[in-house]
Each structure stands twice: as C-alpha cells, then as structure tokens.
Regions:
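N-terminal, post-signal peptide beta-strand-biased segments of exported outer-membrane/organellar beta-barrel
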Residues: 28-134, 138-140, 359, 427, ...
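Outer-membrane beta-barrel porins/channels
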Residues: 30-43, 115-478
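N-terminal secretory signal peptides that target proteins for export/translocation
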Residues: 1-9
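Intrinsically disordered, low-complexity segments
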Residues: 3, 19, 376-379
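Serine/proline-rich low-complexity intrinsically disordered segments, especially terminal tails, linkers
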Residues: 7, 23-26, 107
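Bacterial N-terminal signal peptides
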Residues: 13-24
Length: 478
C-alpha cells in the first residue's frame, strides 16, 4: 500500500535536505567572501592604501616589491574584526493552490567571537649593495565569522537554514617571497603561497512537508542538523609587483595576485529529524568534493612625500570576483536508504550552485606623518576607503554577506630606539543595508528529485552589517 502523501513528501524532503547540507558545506567554504576587510595593522591604519608606499613586511599581501625596503626584520601583529549583522527574512511561497504569500521572520542578530587574526613574518636582506631580500610569512584572512542564535523571541531562529556556528574553522595563508632592488629607483618582487586549513560549520535544513516540502511553516520537529568539515584545503597562488621611484618625493607601485582554486574533500554528518515519519531512514556515505575559484587581484598606487615626514597615498584595488561563477559539489557515494515509498537507494547527485559574482572596486586614500614627541619618533596614520560589493543583490545571503562599504581608520606607530616599532590601529567599517525582495532573490531551494514543486528562492529579506577592526603589532629591524 502506498505511503500517505504527506509522509511520502516528507521523506522526499529528507533527500532534498541532505543535498542542502552538502551544498551548505560548499557554500560555507567561501567564508563570507573569505574576508570582510583588508589586512595588516600598519596598512589598515592607512585604510589599505599601502601599494606604492609598502616598505615593511606588510608588503607580503599588498606589493611584494616593497619587501626590498623591509631590511632584515621581523613582524608580528594581531587584529580583531568585531562583526555584527542583522537579517530579517522574507520568504515568497507559492502553495499548492498557486496562492502567493510572503512570510517574514523575526530579525536575527549575529556577532563574531573574539578571534585574534595573526600576521607573523620575517625577512633577510643581503647582497653587496643589499639589493636582495627574501621573506616568509603566515597570516589569517580577516573573515566575518558570525554566530547566530538558535532561537529568537522563543522561536527557532530564521538563520538556522543559512548557518549556525563556525567553531573549529582555521584558514591561514602562508608564502615565501623574493624582492630585488637593482637601483634606488626600481624594486621588483615575487611571491608563492597557498591558502591552507579547514572550514567547519553547522547548518540546519528543513524537511517540513507543508507547502512544497521546505517552505513555511518549517516546523522544528522536521529540522535536521548537519555538521560538516571542508578540508584539508590547499589552494596555491602567486603574486608579483613593482615599485618605481622616478623622483625623491614620488613612488608608483602596482601588484597582481593570481587566483586560487579551492578543490577539497568534505565530510559531513546529519542528524535526522525527530518526526516519526523519518523512523527507519538512514544516510549512507559521508564524503563529497567541493570546488570553486577565488579571484585574482590587481592593486595600484601613487604615493607622494612632499616632506621627509609626510606620506600620502592614493590606491586602487580591483578584485576579479566575476571568475567566481559557481560552486561545484560532487557527493561521493552519498544516498538515502530504507525509506518506505521511495526506491531502495536514492543517490544524491552533483550540484552546480550559481554564484554569478561581479568584480569589486576599492578606492583608498591613506596618510602617514612622522614627528618627534618626548624624545621618541611617532607615526600618525589615517585613511578612508570605499569598496563596492562583489555580490549582486539577488545572490546575497548570510553565508556570503557583503555590501558596499566605507572604511575610516586611524593608527599610529611608536619607535623605540633604532630597532623597535610598536603599532596600533582602529578602523570602523560602515556597510550599507541591502533589501533583497523575495521576487528578485535568486538563491534557490535545491531539489534534486524530478517532479517536485518549483524551486523557491530562500535569500529574500533585509540585511545590515557593520564592523570594527582593532589591531596591535610590533616590528623589529635587526
């Protein structure tokens, strides 16, 4: 005897839900655009305008040619990105009678834990004219790692279908660099490195039978929690740059970073819903493969030094996110088994999740002024930048939250003797609010089973975010 309709639909929802959990693993690997802010305590004191004027170990990210002026030195700094986000979900539902409804959820707030993002680097300067410099370093991207509550106003959080926790995630960029200064007017640099680590998260999916399997009311007893780990990640890249000093007071710099291809295994666990219709069901297989591409980056800057004490740089950065068209996820032997009313084994197919990102532009102005105070040399830094989002509004979601943003920054450096420099920085990131109407939202429900209801976008709603960046560091010249 065939299973009742609602039971059959719920069991089909389980297959869809497992697919969603795998897809969440793939999407999560992107880590909210990988970073919400540019990096480095001294560079961000200048709002990231540190391309032509790069002259210490902070150059490993901005322009490796600047390492030619880093001398033999060591740098350690730590920054905390205090990130806050709010999301009010709006879901467009077309029920079985073709009635269109928009369901709005309570506003959910997410915040980042206290994570000190490090930079650790060292350089060695050598040659008859000290024209060669080798350097190495490791650092963490300034990722907007937010955790959202499980409940809002006593009800399950609407964010539970986007993301939960990122505990256990660790992504580090490491690399080696070489710089050459043939004359006082020219500097060249090259670097080879890789993004390494692992990404962990929890995501809840719904196999609720009413309104096309996964739509409202999304009863909690039909929720299933998935935990996944993407890794080990090893995504190599390279960079090269040049700095030209045609006049004593003028520096022109540019650099280019190659794209990174993340191609990694994924392992996941799914806790089935507690509803009785899932009794007897099981999931076989735990492995999948995720692949996507992170962008190449072009940086250019012009720095003027009207006096020996004052530096002012205007910089431009273009990140070619249009290369990030999709995330491809291939399950490896994952299937649903033991569900009455379904075939004995329902395999989960490969998925191509559309991203359709766009190139982003950043315009930056930063300054640095050096003066003597009570027998110590002190650097004061300030800057402002504006960056456009790489995420088209229709594809914005909590898993990859990014908007147009403006950064205001202040920083300073205290020189102690001839060898030590102590740095500090504060920046505030003003991000614009974005409303994604349910009609324009384009992140779909993923349904691998033919014959089910039409796909419905799930990322509609209002998004807002802001962040503070605080950092301290020390630089030592041998």
């Amino acid at each position: 005897m065939p299973a009742p309709s609602h039971r059959r639909r719920a069991r089909l929802g389980l297959a869809v839900g497992v697919t969603l959990s795998l897809l969440a693993a793939a999407r999560g690997g992107h880590a909210a655009g990988l970073y919400f802010s540019d990096r480095g305590v001294r560079p961000m004191g200048r709002a990231g305008a540190f391309v032509a004027g790069a002259d210490d170990l902070g150059a490993i990210w901005y322009n490796p040619a600047g390492l030619a002026d880093a001398k033999t030195s060591a740098l350690v700094d730590f920054s905390w990105l205090r990130f806050n986000a709010e999301y009010t979900r709006a879901l467009r539902i077309v029920d079985a009678d073709d009635v269109v409804r928009v369901v709005r959820s309570p506003t959910v707030e997410g915040s980042s834990p206290v994570i000190p993002f490090p930079t650790i680097a060292g350089s060695y300067n050598f040659g008859e004219r000290r024209e060669f410099t080798v350097a190495g370093g490791v650092f963490a991207p300034y990722a907007a790692i937010a955790t959202y509550p499980e409940t809002v106003d006593g009800r399950p959080s609407p964010a539970r279908y986007a993301l939960g926790s990122f505990e256990g995630s660790a992504l580090i960029f490491g690399g080696g660099f070489f710089a050459y200064k043939p004359t006082e007017q020219l500097r060249f640099g090259i670097g080879l490195g890789a993004l390494v680590g692992q990404y962990q998260s929890t995501v809840t999916f719904s196999a609720s039978p009413p309104d096309r399997l996964l739509a409202a009311p999304e009863q909690p007893e039909y929720d299933a929690e998935s935990r996944f780990r993407v890794g080990p990640i090893f995504a190599p890249t390279g960079s090269f740059g040049a700095t030209w000093v045609p006049l004593r007071f003028l520096r022109v710099g540019a650099s280019f970073q190659l794209p990174m291809v993340v191609s990694s295994s994924t392992r996941f666990d799914v806790r089935l819903p507690t509803a009785s219709v899932f009794d007897g069901g099981r999931i076989t297989g735990r492995d999948a493969h995720v692949r996507f591409t992170l962008p190449h980056i072009l940086r250019a800057g012009v720095e003027v030094r009207p006096t020996d004490e004052l530096r002012i740089e205007a910089a431009y950065v273009r990140e070619f996110w249009s290369i990030h068209e999709s995330i491809d996820m291939t399950p490896e032997g994952v299937a649903i088994e033991g569900i009455r009313g379904l075939p004995p084994r329902v395999p989960i197919p490969a998925i191509k999740f559309p991203r359709n990102f766009q190139d982003s532009d950043s315009f930056r102005i930063g300054s640095e002024y050096t003066f003597d105070l009570a027998g110590y040399k002190l650097d004061l830094r300030a800057g402002v930048s504006h960056e456009t989002s790489a995420i088209p509004r229709a594809y914005l979601s909590l898993l990859t939250i990014d908007m147009d943003k403006t950064v205001l920054s202040l920083g300073g450096g205290l020189h102690v003797g001839e060898h030590w420099r102590l740095d500090a920085m504060y920046a505030h990131l003003f991000a614009s609010s974005v409303t994604v109407s349910p009609e324009e939202a384009r992140i779909p429900r993923v349904n691998p089973l033919p014959g089910n209801a039409p796909l419905e976008a799930v990322n509609g709603g209002q998004y807002s975010a802001s962040a503070d960046l605080v950092g301290v560091g020390v630089n030592y010249i041998f």
